[in-house]
């Protein structure tokens, strides 16, 4: 898009196409831009759309990753996954964590155990990692055992 000013309208158009009716973005970083808002429902939709992209799906499950940029001045960027559930909670394949003073501690996570998927969208948590891990484990505890 070339600039934040050009990118944000495209970001909002994609959100509408994904059915994210409760979201409006004002900043590509997810920080507290004026008028920016979202909902757990919309973030679940966004997470599902992101995980459907092979390049994203391959990286969100890693504790660390690198990405090579394209074009003039191409370089390799290193990332550390900020989702503390990755590599620590059985089956978690990542997604996104964040914090702002208005939204509090937030996390979007998906875990896969056997044939079952559990999605978690937590917003405004005081303590997110232990709470999220417990919620994921509790959700899987409700899944019936496979038949022999």
Regions found by a protein language model. Give the residues of each.
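Penicillin-recognizing serine hydrolase domain
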Residues: 2-148
